[in-house]
Design a protein with these regions (language model features):
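Active-site neighborhood of HAD-like aspartate-dependent phosphohydrolases
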Residues: 2-59
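Hydrophobic "anchor" residues on beta-strands that sit immediately upstream
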Residues: 10-12, 61, 143, 182
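Metal-dependent phosphoesterase signature
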Residues: 19-43, 66-78, 92-93, 111, ...
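Substrate-recognition element of Asp-dependent hydrolases with the DxDx(T/V) motif
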Residues: 46, 50-89, 95-109, 155
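Structural recognition of alpha->loop->beta junctions
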Residues: 83-102, 174-195
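Conserved Lys-Pro-Asp/Glu-containing loop-to-beta segment of HAD-superfamily phosphomonoesterases
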Residues: 119-152
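Short, hydrophobic alpha-helical segments
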Residues: 135-137, 191-200
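Acidic, Mg2+-coordinating phosphoryl-transfer loop and its flanking beta/alpha structural elements
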Residues: 140-185
Length: 200
């Protein structure tokens, strides 16, 4: 497949804080990824927003850092059940991901094989580049949506346009991190931005 054949647009989506709600971890006092299936809660407006993107011809690709197993916080089986719970809720609304990409590693992990540096953890664009090659996606016509600076850096490194959800316009979030092309309050607003922009 030549570069000229890459014409399909995609929306690459972070998971926690974008599609489903973050959960308060009482041990750390921080809002984190859900550690139990019952804690998975799809954010309001997300299913119809994703359906609009899907109907407009965008491939939906989930790209998420999920280091809780590497950090010893949960089992691989639990991570799988959490994903299945989320997928089941979205399938009820006819939402289908072209690919689901989870990085299970962490630089400070405690489990062999999942600790240390890896090629796939965001901000690395590795998953986006793989999806481009496997599905013939045009990254220049695609978008990355996330709530963290690493999501925005990932998208920019891959050559997509970027939207930060839940951030203040013009604020990058961390010193030295890139500013998103757009900053909005929710996935619903992010979809309005995408569908209002011409294919470039």
């Amino acid at each position: 497949m030549g570069i000229g054949d890459l014409t399909r647009p995609a929306v690459f989506l972070d998971r926690d804080g974008v599609i489903n709600a973050l959960v308060l971890n009482p041990e750390t006092g921080r809002m984190e990824s859900p550690l139990m299936p019952d804690a998975v809660q799809v954010l309001p407006g997300v299913p119809p927003a994703l359906f609009r993107l899907q109907s407009a011809g965008y491939s939906l690709v989930l790209v998420s850092n999920q280091p809780n197993y590497a950090l010893g916080k949960c089992t691989l089986d639990t991570l799988g059940v959490i994903h299945n719970r989320l997928a089941a809720e979205l399938i009820r609304d006819q939402i289908h991901f072209t690919r689901v990409c989870y990085c299970l590693h962490h630089p400070k992990g405690v489990l062999p094989g999942y600790s240390g540096l890896c090629v796939c953890r965001k901000p690395s664009p590795w998953f986006l580049l793989r999806a481009r090659d496997d599905f013939g996606l045009s990254l220049a016509e695609s978008w990355m949506i996330g709530d963290q600076p690493t999501d925005i850096q990932c998208g920019k490194s891959a050559g997509t346009r970027t939207i930060r959800v839940g951030s203040v316009p013009g604020i990058s979030g961390h010193k030295g991190s890139p500013t998103a092309d757009y900053a909005v309050g929710s996935m619903v607003e992010a979809v309005e931005v995408i569908l209002g922009q011409p294919i470039r």
